[in-house]
């Protein structure tokens, strides 16, 4: 049985068929939902931020709320710098367990000095601070680094706010590949083309993006250097070249090629050479994704009659089926901690994001939208970014793994699709 075009939710449709420039539009983050356990935190307006082009306190507040781990306490009208010790009694009465204060000061050379202090309101302790000297263009990045500092101090886990996402937009007859902050802001165009761009995939060190371009009137795989804008051809074999995914060590990719007839999964060396075929079926095998430890390659196949998710060893061999709930499951993504599988399942006529605990095999739908696609985990495994349609608009969303906290990153105009969350910055 062949896989229908909707298998891909765009990415797999290919089976059937310079440097960065500033974004033309910014995103707006809209957070909804209530988590079961959230730390109440007060984030005051930073002293001096009204004269700065970015409101640091607002960015930090949005970051922490979007994570699902924190509940912001009302600080309307409160301005406090890093040297101001909070009145513990007042903030305890307001329900805060922690507080962030800080300042933004312009320097003579045009840069800004950004400082913060984190306070434990319950214990009355100074939990430390940070300072950054940044160019105006990097003020948002400094805010995300503050969020990372606060998140790690209070949860013991590394924050993901200074990481990046890649995604594709379509406006009129133009396709754009974008690189943006984890909240969707600060987008920079990596590639513009009149032909489709699909399947962006970050390299493990965050320096490159593999993607599929149709500029040659067929799907071809490239690797794009994010810093320089230079790119190189990785796969232009006969037929379709699609769905690239990096190995955890960054030394090779796996991809779907139809060079030998049917769509099968191959390993591609970065320096060229003949690709190694990993699957040997008469069905469509596609959408490969490595497990973070490199022990498995997960992929989608219709070898059982309908699309399901399987896994195999990285050298190929006999695959084992992973998904058994639902008759149509696609778009596998494995969490960096190796515990979770995110995928899209067709439920009736709707495509809904599911999360499976791999140890138990228990799968749960976590969205109430009906056109979900392209899930990708944050590098700390706590959030998933995905594309969907909401209120008649294409949008990017993030969600916690339980689906309790969602944030919509909604841009102005155009379809927004194919997100991929980059690794921690090194």
From Swiss-Prot:
Signal peptide: 1-25
Family that this chain belongs to: Belongs to the TolB family.
Keywords: Cell cycle, Cell division, Periplasm, Signal
Protein known as: Tol-Pal system protein TolB
HAMAP family tied to this protein: TolB
InterPro entries referenced in this protein's UniProt entry, alphabetically: 6-blade_b-propeller_TolB-like, PD40, Tol-Pal_TolB, TolB_N
Subunit structure, as described in the record: The Tol-Pal system is composed of five core proteins: the inner membrane proteins TolA, TolQ and TolR, the periplasmic protein TolB and the outer membrane protein Pal. They form a network linking the inner and outer membranes and the peptidoglycan layer.
BP-aspect Gene Ontology terms: cell division; protein import
GO cellular component: a single term: periplasmic space
Pfam families: PD40 (PF07676), TolB_N (PF04052)
